[in-house]
Amino acid sequence: MIAPIDVHAVLQESVPGPYAALVTRPTGRAVRERIERAIADAPVAWMDFSGVRCIDYSCADEIVAKLLRTVEILLLKGVTEAHRLAIEPVLQGHNLAVVILTGTGLEVLGPPEAAALVCEELLTRRLAERTAGGTLALTAA
């Protein structure tokens, strides 16, 4: 089962006011705790960052890196280049990887060793398959 999460909606529920930015560690912690309750026992989570204006390193660490200790596979969509700039160094620092749905398919973000493990897990769970070009395509969401 894939647990879907609208990160912007969770942010709105977690922090008073019309915030669209994931900044500060306390904000990240509040959002992550709500997400953890929503995805309890789900091995795969799907997080949509559409509507999130920006995310800083501390929130990327609190949300993405710490959730990867809870779920086996984390799928992200609606990720902008600005989001990537905060998320990628956090993944590198923790030797973790996530799967990003892009306009052209799937991309695994993280160090090569962690990325290879995530790709293998996607194939094993039949969440993705290899295309004729050798890339991965999502089969379930």
PLM features: residue spans?
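Short, loop-centered acidic/histidine patches that primarily coordinate divalent metals
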Residues: 79, 111, 133
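Short amphipathic alpha-helical interface segments
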Residues: 92-116
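A short acidic, often aromatic-flanked loop/helix-cap motif at beta-alpha or helix-coil junctions
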Residues: 12-13, 82-84, 106
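Amphipathic alpha-helical interaction surfaces in cytosolic regulatory modules
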Residues: 19-44, 49-98
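Short, cationic-aromatic polyanion-contact patches
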Residues: 130-141
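Preference for short coil/turn "hinge" residues that link or interrupt alpha-helices
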Residues: 4, 45-48, 121
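Short amphipathic alpha-helical interaction segments
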Residues: 109-125, 130
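Extended, compositionally biased accessory segments flanking or bridging domains
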Residues: 1-25
